[in-house]
Amino acid sequence: MKIFKIDANTIATGTTDVGLRRSQNEDAFLIDSKIGLIALADGVGGRDAGEVASFEAINALQEYLAECHDKGAIRSKDNNPTLRQPVTASGLNSTSHLLDQTLAAVIHANDKVYTMNQDRGLPPDRSMGTTLIGLICAPDDPWSTVAFHVGDSRLYRLRDGQIEQLTRDDT
């Protein structure tokens, strides 16, 4: 297992396991230290292609945030890159911009899975689904971190030997 250094105060590592009850692993995770992203998606069991939904959601999230990071841009709701202020490292990584980027990226990931369901003609009771949870850390400011989650995957913090649950299940 590889350990990734995200910033001066954050390290991350990850693994998935099929567990004892399922025959197929429907989890996907990503650690991208360049853009400060740590994310996990857990495909919804009992529906079609949860493993595809989790993989595609993670990829869509990473692509969106990497594009924003590389261009120094925040996408608007109509997907056109737009600059909200002059391009500076500290300005682009402000908490306000992290919130905007993260919300837009999660919506983009959801739209990707929704579109795939529509393209496959899957009815709502069988459509692909996934949870999505993670953190994005501003590379220039270790105190600017945004957590996001949809579904019942949980986010925990380990600090001083104590584990604390940071999210409530969204089902």
Language model features: what each stretch is:
Residues 1-171:
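PP2C/PPM-type serine/threonine phosphatase catalytic domain
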